[in-house]
């Protein structure tokens, strides 16, 4: 690539880091790192009504948790927040006003609403009608004087070239174009409070920071022609644009909505539940991008090496919670034990289960976990009363040979000394029951597992019995035998 690659993620500090915004940050990060470019964080905080205290810190903390780093940000550079850049925006607004490419608009919000209502009632597409249309210079001056005398604070609008064609080659979607006449008329570039609107400020920022590529969600496609108008008015070269497809709910097929409460949509949720960040990073990287091939598990370094913007999907990306959980389980299974135990420790501590067996329990259930918080319900067997058996479990325990198996195994446990009660010997005693009774396979192992653990499936049975202890294992078997 000929020009220096400079990309940015520019969040608003209006809340937690959503999975869609995390994807935008991640794809820009991968693009920059793959091409040896620069990844920038810029904070778009001009919407003061939606500003959330600690919103910026939350965004940055969650990006760091994911494993995303950056080269420039408000932490290291001055004026990387829009609220710190107001004089720069004013400079270019004044320039456009002086050149006649923008003008002050005194129409009130009430008048705009009334006109919009009239247009909708007439079946017209709502658009701003230039309030100075048909006025002489004298009439225009009188109108402005009257409005200013009434205390009306103007906005500033960009004069739109209605006959202009605004087109670009989108990195993801190919060629896109809009007609200037379909934008909705002259649009506001500066609000009454003096703050610039998004579509003006973002152009000034991207130009000033020499952004080469803008990669974002396709909900920004409609913003792009307006931004191209600003580039044109100021005589600047526009960056390349790429608009990623929306993320859909895999179950409904509809756009992922914050009202989908069954889906974890904020990175903070995954942190709190004890997911490994590498798993979430890997999963998000495959939301709308495919490296080719059958593999789906990739390290951050592998994703950086493989990332190719030409493989960004034109089809919606399905957010599949089950796939994320499968991926997370794979990461936990292959992670260092110390790393997984460190994740589980706070949950065990809060539940009062940080005993001398804690490490062994985490080791036992590590292959089953999707997230560290699951260590608490998984270890209920060791800290709670014996659970009520399900209908399926009761059906297994109604088998003809079950009492024989349980009585025989109970006798083996009772005959073992404390020194003999170790995992290897427990397995040997199960095999001894098989040899003595002739009962094997599921008819042997399933009744013992259900009688000891109250579940049909679980981790290694001998290790479970060892950690549960001989007395408690015998007690559980007696409880079940009493119901047969």
UniProtKB/Swiss-Prot annotation:
Signal peptide: none annotated. It is found in: Cytoplasm. GO terms for molecular function: ATP binding; glutamate-tRNA ligase activity; tRNA binding; zinc ion binding. This is Glutamate--tRNA ligase. Monomer. A motif ('HIGH' region) lies at residues 11-21. InterPro entries: aa-tRNA-synth_I_cd-bd, aa-tRNA-synth_I_codon-bd_sub2, aa-tRNA-synth_I_CS, aa_tRNA-synth_I_cd-bd_sf, Glu-tRNA-ligase_bac/mito, Glu/Gln-tRNA-synth, Glu/Gln-tRNA-synth_Ib_cat-dom, GluQ/Sye. Belongs to the class-I aminoacyl-tRNA synthetase family. Glutamate--tRNA ligase type 1 subfamily. The gene is gltX. It comes from the Bacteria. Catalyzes the attachment of glutamate to tRNA(Glu) in a two-step reaction: glutamate is first activated by ATP to form Glu-AMP and then transferred to the acceptor end of tRNA(Glu). ATP binds at residue 258. Keywords: Aminoacyl-tRNA synthetase, ATP-binding, Cytoplasm, Ligase, Nucleotide-binding, Protein biosynthesis. The lineage of its organism: Bacteria, Bacillati, Bacillota, Bacilli, Lactobacillales. Its EC number is 6.1.1.17. GO terms for biological process: glutamyl-tRNA aminoacylation. A motif ('KMSKS' region) lies at residues 255-259. One of its GO terms (cellular component) is cytosol. It catalyses: tRNA(Glu) + L-glutamate + ATP = L-glutamyl-tRNA(Glu) + AMP + diphosphate.
């Amino acid at each position: 690539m000929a020009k220096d690659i400079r990309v940015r993620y520019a969040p608003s500090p209006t809340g937690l880091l959503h999975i869609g915004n995390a994807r935008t940050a991640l794809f820009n990060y991968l693009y920059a790192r793959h091409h040896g470019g620069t990844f920038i964080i810029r904070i778009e905080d001009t919407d003061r009504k939606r500003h959330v205290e600690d919103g910026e810190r939350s965004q940055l903390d969650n990006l760091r948790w994911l494993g995303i780093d950056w080269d420039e940000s408000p932490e290291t550079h001055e004026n990387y927040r829009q609220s710190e850049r107001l004089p720069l925006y004013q400079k270019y607004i004044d320039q456009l006003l002086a050149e006649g490419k923008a003008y002050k608009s005194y129409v009130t919000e009430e008048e705009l609403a009334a006109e919009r209502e009239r247009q909708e009632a007439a079946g017209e597409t709502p658009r701003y009608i230039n309030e100075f249309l048909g006025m002489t210079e004298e009439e225009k001056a009188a109108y402005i004087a009257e409005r200013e005398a009434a205390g009306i604070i103007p906005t500033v609008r960009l004069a739109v070239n209605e006959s202009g064609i605004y087109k670009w080659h989108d990195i993801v979607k190919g060629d896109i174009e809009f007609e200037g006449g379909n934008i909705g008329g002259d649009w506001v570039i500066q609000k009454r409070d003096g703050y610039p609107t998004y579509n003006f400020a973002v152009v000034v920022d991207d130009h000033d920071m020499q952004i080469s590529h803008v990669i974002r969600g396709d909900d920004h496609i409609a913003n792009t022609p307006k931004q191209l108008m600003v580039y044109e008015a100021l005589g600047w070269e526009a960056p390349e644009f790429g608009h990623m497809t929306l993320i859909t709910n895999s179950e409904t097929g509809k756009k992922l909505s914050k009202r989908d409460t069954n889906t974890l949509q904020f990175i903070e949720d995954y942190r709190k539940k004890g997911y490994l960040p590498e798993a979430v990073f890997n999963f998000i990287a495959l939301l709308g991008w495919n490296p080719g091939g059958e593999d789906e598990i990739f390290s951050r370094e592998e994703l950086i090496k493989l990332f190719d913007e030409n493989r960004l999907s034109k089809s919606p990306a399905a957010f599949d919670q089950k796939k994320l959980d499968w991926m997370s389980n794979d990461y936990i299974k292959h992670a260092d034990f110390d790393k997984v135990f460190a994740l589980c420790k706070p949950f065990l501590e809060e539940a009062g289960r940080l005993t001398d067996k804690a490490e062994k329990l985490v080791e036992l259930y590590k292959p089953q976990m999707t997230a560290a918080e699951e260590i608490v319900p998984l270890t209920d067997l060791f800290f709670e009363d014996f659970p009520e058996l399900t209908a399926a479990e009761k059906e297994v325990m109604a088998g003809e040979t079950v009492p024989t198996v349980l009585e025989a195994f109970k006798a083996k446990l009772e005959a073992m000394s404390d020194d003999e009660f170790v995992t290897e010997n427990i397995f040997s005693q199960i095999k001894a029951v098989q040899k003595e009774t002739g009962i094997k396979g599921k008819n042997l192992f399933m009744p013992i597992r259900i009688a000891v653990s109250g579940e049909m499936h679980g981790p290694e049975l001998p290790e479970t019995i060892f950690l549960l202890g001989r007395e408690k294992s015998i007690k559980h078997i007696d409880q079940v035998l009493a119901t047969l």
